[in-house]
Design a protein with these regions (language model features):
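Non-catalytic, conserved peripheral segments adjacent to functional cores
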Residues: 1-105, 124-127
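Conserved metal-binding segment of the jelly-roll/cupin
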Residues: 102-125, 131
């Protein structure tokens, strides 16, 4: 697993090990021990899966204390642009956005800490996993 920090503080791009062979592709997106080795939150309380149609903008999901949580976002089919809005009051990037592209073939995962408001846009039919 490769963990790469992005421009937004605390937001990470995780690239899990991907095995490709004649049968297809095998990806293990979450391994508790590996996440802990990188000091990442592993106590996820919910999991969601959505399928969006072409040109749909979805999201602006966030929780306020005491319900705020970390999120894992990955594209399971096609391609998405994930937009993260910084809603951390007092942050130098408060109310600023960053666009991060995710392609299902890469298997990458965004690790999003509390107080970021994610939403995403798919230009094809897509699947999106939130943990």
């Amino acid at each position: 697993m490769i963990v790469e920090p992005l421009n937004l503080p605390g937001v990470l791009r995780i690239t899990p090990k991907i095995v490709r062979d004649v049968r297809g592709v095998f990806i293990k997106p979450f391994v508790d021990v590996e996440y802990r080795e990188h000091n990442l939150q592993t106590n996820f309380a919910e999991e969601y899966y959505s399928i969006s149609f072409q040109n749909v903008l979805r999201g602006m999901h966030f929780q306020t204390p005491p319900f705020e949580c970390y999120k894992l976002v990955s594209c399971l089919y096609g391609f998405i642009r994930d937009v993260l809005l910084d809603i951390r009051v007092g942050s130098p990037r408060y109310k600023m956005c960053e666009i991060i592209e995710l392609d299902a073939k890469d298997g990458e995962i965004l690790y999003i800490p509390p107080r970021y408001c994610p939403w995403f846009f798919g230009d094809k039919q897509i699947g999106n996993l939130l943990l």
